[in-house]
Amino acid sequence: ADESDVAKRTNIAPTSKLKLMLTDISVVFSIYLVQFIILFSYLFFVLKIPFGDNLQIIILTALLGGLVNIMLGYSIALIFKAKAISIISFGGVIASFLSGMQFVGMKYLVEQHLPLLAYINPAALITDNFYITYYYNDLSRAYLNLGILGLMAVLIGTYCVYRMKGVSYDSL
């Protein structure tokens, strides 16, 4: 990630690392937002898929989930550099599997035997919120999941800023 000439110039620029990171994240999130609007509009207006009565929670879950995953990708790229794409892909498949997206029973196995994993897996929080908003009237767990996703975004973002401050190039 930061081995390229562009990354080296960016890292030694007199711009704060926080501004650089916020710019990167904003651009990627803007692209995600456009994609989300197109997909959601297609599912809702063209295919007429019912999303339940809590559209605002579904939309907020999708947006916060997207932000957390963008931040996770950013942090993994900072840590692993050359192997980041492979690790992100593998991590996404594992997180999705553990959230029950390939095998419904897995979600319940994880919740019974590794409950902490169910609360730190973004895919599990997102799928759980979609399930909760469609089937239940009590949204307290959905709000908890949104809070956890928000906290994850802040913590991962803080880590990224901290990690970027340590990057320097003595010999260019």
Region spans (language model):
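Short juxtamembrane and helix-loop transition motifs at transmembrane-helix boundaries
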Residues: 16-24, 45-56, 81
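Membrane-spanning alpha-helical segments of multipass transporters and channels
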Residues: 50-172
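Hydrophobic alpha-helical transmembrane segments
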Residues: 43-45, 76-77
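Juxtamembrane helix-boundary/capping and inter-helix hinge elements in multi-pass membrane proteins
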Residues: 12-18, 139
